[in-house]
Amino acid sequence: MASERPREPEGEDSIKLSADVKPFVPKFAGLNVAWSESSEACVFPGCAATYYPFVQESPAAEQKMYPEDMAFGAPAFPAQYVSSEIALHPFAYPTYALESTQSVCSVPTLQYDYSQAQCHPGFRPAKPRNEHACPPQEAKCVFKKKSSDERRAWEEQKSSNRRADGAVPCEARPARGSCHLKSDGYHKRPDRKSRILTKSASTSKPEFEFSRLDFPELQSPKNSNLPETQKQPRWGPLGPAASNMSLLGEAGKPVADMVEGKMVKTDHTDGAVTNNAATSSPSCTRELSWTPMGYIVRQTVSSDSAAATETVNSIINLKKTTSSADAKNVSVTSEALSSDPSFSREKRVHPGPKAKASQGSELEQNESSKKNKKKKEKSKSSYEVLPVQEPPRIEDAEEFPNLSVASERRHRGESPKLQSKQQAQNDFKTGGKKSQVPVQLDLGGMLAALEKQQHAPHAKPSSRPVVFSVGAVPVLSKDASSGERGRRSSQVKTPHNPLDSSAPLMKKGKQREIPKAKKPTSLKKIILKERQERMQQRLQESAVSPTVASDDSQDVESGVTNQIPSPDNPTGPEKTEEPMSSTPVVEGESEEPAGTEFQRDPEACQPAPDSATFPKIHSRRFRDYCSQMLSKEVDACVTGLLKELVRFQDRMYQKDPVKAKTKRRLVLGLREVLKHLKLRKLKCIIISPNCEKTQSKGGLDDTLHTIIDCACEQNIPFVFALNRKALGRSLNKAVPVSIVGIFSYDGAQDQFHKMVELTMAARQAYKTMLETMRQEQAGEPGPQTPPSPPMQDPIQSTDEGTLASTGEEPHYIEIWRKHLEAYSQHALELEDSLEASTSQMMNLNL
């Protein structure tokens, strides 16, 4: 019979036999039973031999397989059920020499009903056909007849053999009737592997089990006539065999003799199961699906062979184990090994029709103990998972419904456990890790959200108030880290001009949401008080006598008419102020002739004292604190000078704001000018001539006189030019300005010197006008009064026309004519004197 032989172990030749090894001598060596081949055997393909070492192309008809003959960790049922396990765990099983069926191995110290048996390597000899023709049910009584004395004798014999040999390897040779002993090194590698696996296998959990009720055919009387046999293990450690012996023997199954731990395969006349393949008929097939950790063994056999059905169904739901035992544990008794759960999972026992008769009660008792142990233990796989080629899948679920249901139930029960274990391991590995999602920051969205929060009309106030920039400088956040940097950057930024009221304010420290009301100064209080008093006086006068008010208004009109011709009689320097259309010029013109009127009014007031009573030089637009005549040239020069200084100051603020504060060009306001004037820091003062009149002590007039006196003491030029609004516009201010102080006129020296020259000339003219007015008041003759220029004639004619039209007395006309003549003569004399003086100056310059 041709068969595929697996590779021999590597260390077979190098290992020597031990001196203590006792050779096995079969008791019944004279009887040799030839292996008969079945004509109906189903031959497996040659490729199946690689994954199923027990499969033979032409298997023998009758075989006995002993689980003790295999390495510890190998399954105890036929190879078609455990071939995948052998492929997965090559080091847990010995190499088998699958030889012809004619090989015979005599078995020593064994009790058989027949004289001698033939065995394949790893199998026991099988009985002749005629001995196995009895139905399997007949083995029932045989199992029950086994006594405890025989069990003890067998255990003593087995323990003595273990002490002497440890593990007794044996290998059958092709020669018929000869027995060959193998060295201890033959099983060295499987034993070494079993030592490693025993540690982790003790705590493993049984994967599946079966009960006697699942296989009713085994209870038939066919198996009742099977004699009990005892066998000393031929090769491999004895621990798993003894474990399975006690485990299944207590359950009371008439499947196999578990005391000896052997597996019997029989062949009947109608067809039998060989040790490697289904041999009953071509339709007898098996489907195997084997995985390391408790996956299901599926088998379907046709109904043609009843004996094969009984044999196969008896081993389907046996437990699968994942560990092996150490060779040093051979001295352990069967009771101790039966209590170890790892051994109960190590072997699969494939019973045959020849079963042992004393293990029925033990199997029944051990079945309940296995259920209790199943709940407490968990299976731990120590084998590495390798890809396994699946055997041919041939199913016949109709013949074995219980098998398919039990397999599916076990598969459903085990798959969640494996998944939960894998999930637990993955969770343990990745439990401490953080999320691997990349963090993304959208700066644009953040800025948009901040702007939206700031500009929201009804936004809730946040814990940190939002700071808005008051001036041109952006205000940074007040964080501890950026506090100093914010201060430095705010200093570097160019602020606005603080002298420019139209510019936005700079934030200086803390600011109130509602600014605190300014407390008016004492000067402002006095000014406001006088304004209120004047308003009340006007209201009282208008309410007391409206008729008197009308008469007074007529008198005022007459007084105004008297003052109108007076500007027609100014002197030469006064004529320069006439063409000016601004109100200060008109005031100057009216003030100059007012002085002349003051000289001649006493004469004119004699006939009509009411109309010419004490005319004044100064008015509301030309206040009495002014000491110079107003002129257009002076105003233009002052405007150009101030604009130039303002431009210099703003340019300095743009370059260096800190330096611009120390080197200011201008200062505004009465208080500031007076303060810096007392500090002797000012070089020039420009005063508006139309300041408000306040005669109270400490009022505006007193302050102006104080400023003028200080300037005269320090010999600082002061100029009266422009009005308050014009002075503010020249400084780029929208508010009226009363007084301006100049710290430095560098860069505008020409304009400054020109302004000073014009101011000196206007002041000299003012002095001459005052002298003439004093002379007229002293009673000088009319011709000595300043004559009126000829250009004033059209104004006189208009005045005369108005007087004639109003129907006034011609006496005024005569008086005005006399005055005009006197003014004309005086004007001619002044012209002559001026010409003489100018000629003298020209001569001196030459």
Curated annotation (Swiss-Prot):
Tissue: Ubiquitous.
Region (Disordered): 151-246, 266-288, 321-440, 448-467, 475-613, 774-804
Transmembrane segments: none
Highest taxon, organism lineage: Eukaryota
InterPro entries reported in the protein's UniProt record: Ribosomal_eL30-like_sf, Ribosomal_eL8/eL30/eS12/Gad45, SECISBP2
Record has Lipid metabolism as a keyword: no
GO MF annotation terms: DNA binding; mRNA 3'-UTR binding; ribonucleoprotein complex binding; RNA binding; selenocysteine insertion sequence binding; translation factor activity, RNA binding
SUPFAM superfamilies for this protein: L30e-like
Placement of sequence motif Nuclear localization signal: 370-380
Record-listed Phosphoserine modification sites: S220
Alphabetic keyword roster: Cytoplasm, Nucleus, Phosphoprotein, Protein biosynthesis, RNA-binding
Pro residues composition bias: residue spans: 783-792
GO biological process, alphabetically ordered: forebrain neuron development; mRNA stabilization; negative regulation of nuclear-transcribed mRNA catabolic process, nonsense-mediated decay; positive regulation of selenocysteine incorporation; RNA catabolic process; selenocysteine incorporation; striatum development; translation
Protein name, UniProt field: Selenocysteine insertion sequence-binding protein 2
Encoding gene (name): Secisbp2
